[in-house]
A protein has these predicted regions:
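C-terminal beta-sandwich interaction modules and adjacent acidic
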Residues: 1-435
Length: 435
């Protein structure tokens, strides 16, 4: 006997903001009659952190041993279950053939943004289940991205230019050199994914050593907080993007201005999450030849979801969502996206909103066929400012994260690949936002 169950989200890029309505369908196909209790759709959103630390202990015999402790924490933001047909105390016969069940859920307004990190994550998913009588339950899962707006225009501090200076002298054989001065400057500290940060770096090398290389890196700093078995924090730092500058000779000064492009990344702070905190900064480093420590300056960066108006070229403000072409509907194999969503790019032949796998007892979770039209543009969440050119919703630069979500059912597929999407803008003058 072959059974199929699929989830189709009406928003093909599976990206939503708090307060949006998630709509979709559960598709079930059975070759023979099935005795079931119900078919359900369960929505959930959670934050989880977990890491393991080791420590050495000496036992009563004076022997040393290594003890491992796992620290963890959990927060739940969304838990909604609906019965699409039947119920826990019912028994119904599902006739052979194909069956489609619609679902709809309104997301709470204050959800934190989706996030994938080394020691923790924030994930949202819908699980469809067919509860069979005297048989294994059949389940399939679909992950989706949730975003929390971070409007840079509402924070006056991120609009201001910032200059940071560091200075040191080098000592060798009781002699002090002239000063080494490193200066970093940006015209603002609030940006969005897709933008280029104009970075000005100045090096005044009054020493007798060469500055072998100068770099500027965008760093992602994450603080994970666990509450079990005790409260503890774990901090990670990753270089996201790096630009380099040429060496600076002894008693030489140089100044450069370069652009550092921001890839698709989650917004700063992860508002409304109490166990994961996210910050970004520019780390400008002068590497000194010889046995000397390097010189650094750091500039905090706020990554938002809505760009500063002052950084949008006037010509691009004319590309309002209302003037963008709508997706074709006549030949599309699926119903058109909801009219309240503006359009956003959708890579052809991708299935970001549906997960699939093959189980052990003849049950298959199969992807719905995707639209074949290369110009089909799916729906995307709306922006609060109609004059801002709409972003695309790009997969996070960190790529695929293997997802294992536990389930009490014996017939659940694990190992789903999940990549959150984040709003990414093209605000360069003379170039239209990608469609």
């Amino acid at each position: 006997m072959v059974r199929q169950i699929r989830i189709y989200l009406d928003n093909p890029i599976a990206t939503y903001y708090g307060g949006d309505t998630v709509t979709g369908k559960v598709f079930v196909k059975v070759d023979d009659e099935e005795k079931i209790r119900y078919i359900s759709a369960k929505f959930r959103g959670d934050a989880n952190v977990s890491w393991t630390e080791s420590d050495s202990e000496t036992d009563s015999d004076g022997k040393s041993r290594t003890v491992y402790t796992t620290y963890s924490a959990h927060e739940n933001y969304l838990m909604t279950k609906m019965y699409l047909v039947g119920g826990p105390s019912q028994e119904i016969i599902l006739p052979p053939g194909e069956h489609i069940y619609n679902f709809s859920v309104i997301l709470p307004e204050n959800l934190p943004s989706s996030f994938e990190g080394i020691n923790g994550n924030i994930r949202y998913m819908v699980r469809a289940k067919m509860n069979r009588v005297w048989a294994f339950d059949d389940t399939v899962k679909a992950f989706f991205t949730v975003l929390s707006h971070l409007d840079l225009n509402k924070d006056p501090l991120v609009k201001e230019p910032v200059t940071t200076v560091a200075e040191k002298t080098l000592c060798c054989c009781c002699c002090r050199s002239g000063p080494l001065t490193l200066v970093g400057n940006v015209p603002a500290v609030g940006f969005v994914s897709g933008q280029e940060i104009p970075v000005t770096v100045e090096v005044d090398n009054g020493t007798n050593e060469t500055i072998s290389i100068v770099t500027c890196s965008l760093k992602k700093n994450v603080c994970f907080t666990a509450h079990s078995p005790s409260t503890r924090t774990n901090k990670t730092s990753e270089k996201v993007e790096t630009i380099t500058f040429e060496p600076v000779g002894e008693n030489e000064s140089k100044t450069w201005t370069k652009q550092l492009k921001i890839p698709s990344l989650p917004p700063s702070t992860l508002k409304n999450c109490g166990i994961i905190d996210l910050e970004y900064c520019l780390d400008i480093k002068a590497e000194i030849s010889g046995p000397h420590t390097n010189l650094h300056v750091n500039i905090p960066i706020t990554l938002g979801t809505i760009p500063l108006f002052t950084y949008i070229p006037p010509g691009l403000l004319q590309n309002t969502p209302e003037k963008l072409p709508l997706p074709p509907t006549a030949s599309a194999p699926y119903p058109p996206p909801p009219s309240q969503f503006p359009t956003a790019p959708y890579p052809a032949n991708t299935a970001a909103d549906i997960t699939s796998g093959t189980s052990q007892l003849g049950f298959s979770n199969v992807l719905l066929p995707l639209p074949s039209q290369s110009n089909l543009t799916p729906s995307a969440p709306p922006l609060p400012y109609p004059d801002i050119p709409p972003p695309s919703y790009e997969e996070c630069m960190y790529g695929t994260s293997n997802v294992n979500v536990g389930d009490n059912a014996s017939h659940t597929e694990e190992g789903y690949n999940h990549v959150p999407r984040y709003p990414t803008y093209n605000l360069r003058p003379g170039e239209a936002t990608r469609m």
